[in-house]
């Protein structure tokens, strides 16, 4: 399994390994102080408030999963079983399934790391069901 954000030290769970409510590279939510007002955010070094606001666009979170199968035929069967499942949040989470030899490759792209995490978890549940079903019925017969 390979996470593109892991190269920079973060992941889909919030980036800092704590599994908190913030997304690395995304919008962090901060708790309001006792007075009730949210904390003010100062622009970074050499930036004024206007350029900080323009530069606050989030980079998309990208997650790629490579699933090896014993044979290319089994990878194709899994692809055929999993590809028809539409993504519930199609506007904010993109999911692309491809097969390369005996490897099923799934690539997600999302603006919101929480929706990305939900999509990956749901996919892993479906993948688990497909793999267990394939194991129960035995190796496929060549077409």
Swiss-Prot record:
It is found in: Cytoplasm; Nucleus. The keyword Cytoplasm applies. Pfam families: Pcc1. This is EKC/KEOPS complex subunit LAGE3. Belongs to the CTAG/PCC1 family. GO terms for biological process: tRNA processing; tRNA threonylcarbamoyladenosine metabolic process. Keywords: Cytoplasm, Disease variant, Epilepsy, Intellectual disability, Nucleus, tRNA processing. GO terms for cellular component: cytoplasm; EKC/KEOPS complex; nuclear body; nucleoplasm; nucleus. It comes from Homo sapiens (Human). Its main location: cytoplasm. The lineage of its organism: Eukaryota, Metazoa, Chordata, Craniata, Vertebrata. Component of the EKC/KEOPS complex that is required for the formation of a threonylcarbamoyl group on adenosine at position 37 (t(6)A37) in tRNAs that read codons beginning with adenine. The complex is probably involved in the transfer of the threonylcarbamoyl moiety of threonylcarbamoyl-AMP (TC-AMP) to the N6 group of A37. LAGE3 functions as a dimerization module for the complex. Component of the EKC/KEOPS complex composed of at least GON7, TP53RK, TPRKB, OSGEP and LAGE3; the whole complex dimerizes. InterPro entries: CTAG/Pcc1. Residues 1-57 are annotated as: Disordered. Residues 30-55 have a biased composition (Low complexity). Ubiquitous. Disulfide bonds: none annotated. It is linked to Galloway-Mowat syndrome 2, X-linked: A form of Galloway-Mowat syndrome, a severe renal-neurological disease characterized by early-onset nephrotic syndrome associated with microcephaly, central nervous system abnormalities, developmental delays, and a propensity for seizures. Brain anomalies include gyration defects ranging from lissencephaly to pachygyria and polymicrogyria, and cerebellar hypoplasia. Most patients show facial dysmorphism characterized by a small, narrow forehead, large/floppy ears, deep-set eyes, hypertelorism and micrognathia.
């Amino acid at each position: 399994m390979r996470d593109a954000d892991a190269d920079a030290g973060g992941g889909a769970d919030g980036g800092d390994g704590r599994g908190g409510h913030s997304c690395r590279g995304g919008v962090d939510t901060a708790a309001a102080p006792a007075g009730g007002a949210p904390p003010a955010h100062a622009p970074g070094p050499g930036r004024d408030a206007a350029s900080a606001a323009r530069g606050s666009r989030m980079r998309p979170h990208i997650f790629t999963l490579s699933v090896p199968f014993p044979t290319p035929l089994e990878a194709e069967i899994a692809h055929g079983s999993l590809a028809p499942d539409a993504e519930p949040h199609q506007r904010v989470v993109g999911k692309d399934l491809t097969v390369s030899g005996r490897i099923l490759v799934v690539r997600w792209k999302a603006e919101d790391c929480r929706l990305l995490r939900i999509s990956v978890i749901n996919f892993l549940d479906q993948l688990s069901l497909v793999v267990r079903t394939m194991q129960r019925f035995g190796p496929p017969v060549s077409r």
